[in-house]
Amino acid sequence: MRGSARVRAPRVLKERSIGDSDLTIDQLREILRSHRVLHLSLAARDRIAHSRKIVEELAEGPGALYGINTGFGVLAHQQISRSDLEQLQENLILSHAVGVGDEVPIEIVRLMLLLKAQGLALGYSGVRVLVIDYLLRFFNEDFIPIILTKGSLGASGDLAPLAHLTLPALGFGEVDFKGSRISAKIALQRLGLEPLRLKAKEGLALINGTQFMSAYAVYCLIRIQLLLATADLAAAMTLESIRGSAAPFNARIHEARPHPGQVRTAAIMRQLLTGSEILPSHLDCPKVQDPYSIRCVPQVHGAARDAYAHAHRVVEIEINSATDNPLVFREGDILSGGNFHGEPLALILDYLAIAVAEIASISERRLYLMLGGDTLGELKLPRLLMKDTGLNSGFMLPQYTAAALTSENKILAHPASVDSIPSSLGQEDHVSMGATSATKLLEVVKNTETVLAIELMSAAQALDFIHPLKAGKGVEAAHAEIRKSISFAESDRLFHDDIQCALRLVRSGALVHAAEKSVGPFTK
């Protein structure tokens, strides 16, 4: 009716079951971004219930079974009376919640909830369906446990952070509940839930596992995929600004050394440079070869791309694996092993840190090249990318920041996995230190995103001196996107603000998306 108020349709949240099939990193990205409502599949419920029945039957017997009626670690040989089994599980969570340091980012904690539920849904852990329902309810309701970054040795699993993940289900600790920090008890009341009383083996199943390392790995891989595409775009823009040659990207060169990442990167560079007016404008210049930071982009970026691909494969195996101990098998056996050991993740997390640090290293060198100005004097590219230097410092200091971050990355890229300190009075005599690998990788990723942002904002400044000649279509599209929010710098100004703006463009994917609209996709 005319004049009546329009009724807004309620937002419909899409549901997704877990436990039927493996999860991919792409699916995890989509789940995080779309806020899907998760629930256990019927098949998973049956599988979990069967596993739980085995545990309950064995718990009634007289024998000692690790994780069910014994102590833990060096205390594994000490049998616990049947009347104390529930208290044993609560004590385990409380005693292992010893994390320190900064808080884990909320998106990573959400991944931990999801990955822990996925691991338990495989049916090897012997927990009740109710336990997994709690985890998924937390995920769906933005009930985010407060977890601290430090305290895990990466074997026996991520004990401390996973204990902090579990605490709120028992009514302990604090949570971020729908954006507000409140006590876990109050948050449970708002959800209409009672604190969970853990049964035999459930506490151990919740804290044994690699979900802290895995969540960091998934989160970083999602960011690194965009970072690699951004690095190619930055390299292409810098190449145009210093009148570099596209000859090193000729497909025949890379067919002669066909590492997949190298071949792919060279193809992306050709794609981004398509339609350039700058490239043919200096074909007869006296320059014979560009410096390595330009000429070897396919080899360096490509090697990082191959490291990403290897890590991607390893992580997708890990997030769909049983990393608990002991494991409960359908035949009725309970077997102790070492699937909680984080070595597979620790190695690839360290590998990724090295690869991403190299992206920052070569980006900073390209930035430095631009600041030297136009050595041939043909396109009037001024030193420090500003005409009136002396009075103005130009882009001198943004390079300092890039250099500082690049140097910090070199320290962070030292592999944590080469170290091990025995714990539990020698029972756990080799650990992966993969949790340290995980947290420092995220810092390397953040630093490298910033270095690329500085390169891109500087390359945009340089291109403006070369216009009206047009760069390649992909480069021009990204340049136009930068200029929507960062203007050409005629003189010194607060470059901190420009860096932050460029960083937002990098992390949002706005520059890559703008280029892809012009030349087609190149992110994958």
Residue ranges, per PLM feature:
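Short alpha-helical scaffolding segments that buttress acidic/His motifs in well-ordered protein cores
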Residues: 28, 92, 96, 108, ...
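FAD-binding glycine-rich core of flavoenzymes that anchor FAD
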Residues: 123-150
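Residues that scaffold, gate, or flank divalent-cation-dependent active/transport sites
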Residues: 16, 22-57, 63-68, 72-110
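Conserved, non-catalytic sequence blocks in retroelement Pol enzymes and Pol-derived host proteins
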Residues: 124, 153-155, 390
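FAD-binding core of FAD-dependent oxidoreductases
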Residues: 66-88, 95-118, 148-170, 199-213, ...
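Alpha/propeptide regions of enzymes that mature by internal proteolysis
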Residues: 103, 123-127, 229, 313-314
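C-terminal auxiliary extensions adjacent to catalytic cores
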Residues: 10-36, 40-47, 51-59, 168-524
